[in-house]
Amino acid sequence: MSIGVPIKVLHEAEGHIVTCETNTGEVYRGKLIEAEDNMNCQMSNITVTYRDGRVAQLEQVYIRGSKIRFLILPDMLKNAPMLKSMKNKNQGSGAGRGKAAILKAQVAARGRGRGMGRGNIFQKRR
């Protein structure tokens, strides 16, 4: 099983300044050293803001992925190549021209599998 696009973008953020909020409401801002596929994050040079508003400086921190509420990544990652490929995939699904497009639409509308309807309900049973 391959990793999804959001995790790929998270890996792209390694080495950049990110903000991470945990489920307990603490906010960590610092350099993302490493991110794992399960969203475990190792960060350095951290400014942590606790729920009561206190601010502290930490040298290193390791946050378990299941305890992360959300991450704020740098805006420069909007141009990441994996996001470009997602845009291109959606681009080709517009209306085509000619008979081929009509046939494609008919095939797509038919569906798959057994769901062929009830048939003739007035048919004599055997």
UniProtKB/Swiss-Prot annotation:
Region described as 5 X 2 AA tandem repeats of [RM]-G: 110-119
PROSITE patterns: SM (PS52002)
Keyword Calcium in annotation: no
Gene3D superfamilies xrefs: 2.30.30.100
Subcellular location: Cytoplasm, Cytosol; Nucleus
Modification after translation, per record: Methylated on arginine residues by PRMT5 and PRMT7; probable asymmetric dimethylation which is required for assembly and biogenesis of snRNPs.
Keywords per UniProt: Acetylation, Cytoplasm, Methylation, mRNA processing, mRNA splicing, Nucleus, Repeat, Ribonucleoprotein, RNA-binding, Spliceosome
Domain Sm: 5-77
Mapped Sequence repeat ranges: 110-111, 112-113, 114-115, 116-117, 118-119
GO terms for cellular component: catalytic step 2 spliceosome; commitment complex; cytosol; methylosome; nuclear body; nucleoplasm; nucleus; pICln-Sm protein complex
SUPFAM superfamilies per record: Sm-like ribonucleoproteins
Biological process per Gene Ontology, one example term: 7-methylguanosine cap hypermethylation
Principal location listed in the UniProt entry: cytoplasm
Residue(s) carrying N-acetylserine: S2
Assembly, per entry: Core component of the spliceosomal U1, U2, U4 and U5 small nuclear ribonucleoproteins (snRNPs), the building blocks of the spliceosome. Most spliceosomal snRNPs contain a common set of Sm proteins, SNRPB, SNRPD1, SNRPD2, SNRPD3, SNRPE, SNRPF and SNRPG that assemble in a heptameric protein ring on the Sm site of the small nuclear RNA to form the core snRNP. Component of the U1 snRNP. The U1 snRNP is composed of the U1 snRNA and the 7 core Sm proteins SNRPB, SNRPD1, SNRPD2, SNRPD3, SNRPE, SNRPF and SNRPG, and at least three U1 snRNP-specific proteins SNRNP70/U1-70K, SNRPA/U1-A and SNRPC/U1-C.
PANTHER family: SMALL NUCLEAR RIBONUCLEOPROTEIN SM (PTHR23338)
Something else known: In the autoimmune disease systemic lupus erythematosus, antinuclear antibodies are developed with Sm specificity.
Protein family according to the UniProt entry: Belongs to the snRNP core protein family.
Record's protein name: Small nuclear ribonucleoprotein Sm D3
Organism: Homo sapiens (Human)
